Amino acid sequence: VLTSTLARVKGDDGGTIDTKRSQRRRALGRSRGGLTTKLHLITEARGLPMRLHVTGGNVVDCSAFEAVMAGRRLARIGPGRPRTRPDRLIADKDYSSRKIRTYLRRRGIQAVIPERRDQLANRRRKGGRGGRPYAFDAEAYKERNLVERCFGKLKQWRAIATRFDKLASRYLAGATIGCLMLWLRQLEMSDTL
């Protein structure tokens, strides 16, 4: 399950010259609300975080897709090396693009991504030349709430909900510690059962 969330940046006077390059390196993006950072997250089937990626708040979600998908590994049941391809990927409309769907199709991953309204209108406007509608499993899409609940648990930590760190690497480290805490809490709960 894949999605992203914004974190508002507080207290960033920077202390350095604020160039576009330094903003990209520090994962800062300027929008109407000021400086923001976007945290992209992939969770596994139980809603536990697997892969984090940080970008500026003004970066489009689909442009960070390949970076988010790059480093994840899924443990196998029994012996064998970890899998690099999940059975399916559930994502929101922000990740609905031809490039992402092609990426997933080539790797044999089922895409459970709703079609955006403008894509649907363009396909219908073209008629028979617009192609077939994308397959969409509405029942499987209901599992997307797992990643939203994971973000809710992560944002209980003040440093993740509101970014105070100057460097993106420190913010990512704090978010990673939050993810580790979620995994440890899950292990602790499974040991008591």
Predicted segments with their positions:
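Short, catalytically relevant binding-site loops at active-site mouths
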Residues: 7-8, 56-60, 72-73, 94-98, ...
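Active-site beta-loop-alpha junctions of metal-dependent nucleic acid enzymes
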Residues: 53-79
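Helix-centered, glycine/charged polyanion-binding patches within enzymatic domains
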Residues: 77-167
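Active-site- or DNA-interface-adjacent structural scaffold in DNA-acting proteins
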Residues: 1-31, 43-46
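Short glycine-rich loop/turn motifs
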Residues: 36-40
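Generic alpha-helical structural context detector
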Residues: 67-70, 152, 179-182
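Charged phosphate-binding loop/patch that engages nucleotide di/tri-phosphates or the phosphate backbone
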Residues: 174-193
